[in-house]
Amino acid sequence: MASLMTLEVLTPDQYLMKRKDIAYVLLNTVTGGIGILANHGPLIAVLGEGTLKLQDGNNHVILLYVEGGFAEVKDNKVIILTPKAELAELSLIHI
């Protein structure tokens, strides 16, 4: 079994998500994409507007739209602070 991380997503209005079963996070930063796996080194990043890709331990993909913000990675925990976030609707995604 792959190592897993905790992910928290917070906006000024709500605590949108807390998951303890995240295997991979693809952050959309202002300087490009950064992939995060368990045991990643500490990191603080400025997020750009766009979609973050999350993958849980069962290989299910979750897409999360954020309007910028910050990400902190430390001790197998990823915290996303953003002014606005929404889970992507699968019906809106063209594959």
Predicted regions and their residues:
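Short, conserved catalytic or interaction motifs in soluble domains
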Residues: E49, G57, D75
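Conserved small/polar residues in nucleotide/adenosyl-binding loops
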Residues: I93-I95
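A positional/architectural concept
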Residues: M1-L47, K53-Q55
